Amino acid sequence: TDYTVSVEAEGETLTLAFRTEDESFFVDASRYGLVADGETDNTGKLQAALSTCPKGGTVYVPAGRYRTSSLFLKSCTTLYLEKGAVLLGDNDRTHYPILPGVLPSENEVDEYYLTGWEGNPLSSFAGLLNITQVHDVVVTGEGTLDCDAQNGDWWVNPKVKRIAWRPRAVAMVDSENVCLHGITVQNSYSWTIHPIFVKHLDLLNFNINNPYNAPNTDGIDPESCEYTRIIGVNIHVGDDCIAMKASKVFLGMKLKKSCEHTVIRNCLLDKGHGGIVIGSEMSGGVKDMVVTQCLMDHTDRGLRVKTRRGRGNTAVIDGLVFRNVEMRGVKAPFVINMFYFCDPDGHSPYVQCREAM
């Protein structure tokens, strides 16, 4: 269907024309036997709806609280969460599948990446929603992804690996044409939205809510992504609101994939440690980012760059533009840390000693 919208103000008229995509099938997930009591495990039923949805179809989740562990979306489908629909994360980590960081191929050359942890391809629990090696995927509606991490042990000793590294609320890997729109994501296990090697990613008009004391619960952390738009997102977290990343030295030097062509516009960045952050995992480089019309409200820092010795000669930051950005109650508007080493491998010999590189 074609639409035209016109807005008039102060004698000026702006017109926007757009077309909505055709929907081949409407899949009501409640027909798969969902139990909306917030306790019953609905993982298999929800996954059945997602897996059987035809190309171009929409999986519709009605209002209700649905307990689930990891769900995997497939290409050319839409997940629609109705207002009042809550996907509630399972609190038992043994119910989540473990994804290997990388799978080797038979030719011993090609590699298939599935997940990562703080810039390295390390085995991690699958996220609540997983968008992995797919294309043309939409998650939309006015519903909620609630990881419910505060009622599990996800925030206890967060730097300690237990079985595998912690999951993300929404994990994306090596995918293309992905859109998140309208939903609320809250109480994440660790980083909330973590796309790795994603091209043409739209994160539009949604909310991220994590408690201020929740450890390592960054809002949005694009890693080695291209053509990302983050527009109209309200982020309330206890760590960095938006952190641009490009892997640590192993992947950064091997793949040389920078994070580039990023637009961040009309976002509220509230209470986090950093408003817009570069790094510290940025061995592939961060390039061509434009930030406009954003409000940083009582973040500890405004624009922060984090890097350190050993990131490699591809760790170049270039083409950053900040325009019409307001900061309120920000303790340190601009910070550059050239020797950042909060994570465990920050104490490695090559970081501490130039001769060890």
Residues covered by each model-derived region:
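Extracellular/periplasmic carbohydrate-active domains that bind, remodel
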Residues: 1-357
